[in-house]
Curated annotation (Swiss-Prot):
It comes from the Eukaryota. Pfam families: Complex1_30kDa (PF00329). NCBIfam families: PRK12494.1. SUPFAM superfamilies: Nqo5-like. NDH shuttles electrons from NAD(P)H:plastoquinone, via FMN and iron-sulfur (Fe-S) centers, to quinones in the photosynthetic chain and possibly in a chloroplast respiratory chain. The immediate electron acceptor for the enzyme in this species is believed to be plastoquinone. Couples the redox reaction to proton translocation, and thus conserves the redox energy in a proton gradient. It is found in: Plastid, Chloroplast thylakoid membrane. This is NAD(P)H-quinone oxidoreductase subunit J, chloroplastic. Belongs to the complex I 30 kDa subunit family. InterPro entries: NADH_DH_suC, NADH_quin_OxRdtase_su_C/D-like, NADH_UbQ_OxRdtase_30kDa_su, NADH_UbQ_OxRdtase_CS. The lineage of its organism: Eukaryota, Viridiplantae, Streptophyta, Zygnematophyceae, Zygnematophycidae. Keywords: Chloroplast, Membrane, NAD, NADP, Plastid, Plastoquinone, Quinone, Thylakoid, Translocase, Transport. It is a peripheral membrane protein. GO terms for molecular function: NADH dehydrogenase (ubiquinone) activity; quinone binding. Its EC number is 7.1.1.-.
């Protein structure tokens, strides 16, 4: 898929998408959410350059980073909610960026080096979905024990047999 083909979409292109096109940064507009926040898709290999450009644009706060399983056997998504925090802004500008990866080799460049708040959030997505964030300084399980097998929030995850102890105190 060429960059131009990636940029073309039937979705409405917002102001940030137009800015990214002006600077020849590959992405695909996905429209707006119910609150009017613009949503774009970026390929994982393009994420480092787009993330730096968005930071330079003014998105200095990573409000939330999460992941979800699109469909059983389908792609996984890593989602970044960015906010442009300014002293005099009563309604800060926001953007949602989605990166879709194959569940067979889920790998996304880490944004920790741009937004430090990505640290625990990327670790949680790794722990629950198995998305590897390349160049993350301490990517390891954060909620599950290191010995845990599999990725519990994937739709195709099979729960291991275990027995709950009743009144164990």
């Amino acid at each position: 898929m060429t960059n131009l083909a990636f940029q073309s979409s039937s979705q409405i292109q917002g102001r940030l998408s137009a800015w990214l096109v002006t600077h020849k940064l590959p992405h695909r507009p996905l429209g707006f959410d119910y609150q009017g926040v613009e949503t774009i898709e970026v390929r994982p290999e393009d994420w480092p350059s787009v993330a730096v450009a968005l930071y330079v644009y003014g998105f200095n706060y990573l409000r939330c980073q999460c992941a979800y399983d699109v469909a059983p056997g389908g792609a996984l998504a890593s989602v970044y909610h960015l906010t442009k925090v300014e002293d005099v802004a009563d309604q800060p500008e926001e953007l949602c960026v989605k990166l879709f990866v194959s569940r067979n080799n889920p790998s996304v460049p880490s944004s920790f080096w741009i937004w430090k708040s990505a640290d625990f959030q990327e670790r949680e997505c790794y722990d629950m979905f198995g998305i590897v964030y390349k160049n993350h300084p301490h990517l390891k399980r954060i909620l599950m024990p290191e010995s845990w097998l599999g990725w519990p929030l994937r739709k195709d995850y099979i729960t291991p047999d275990f027995y709950e102890l009743q009144d164990a105190y």
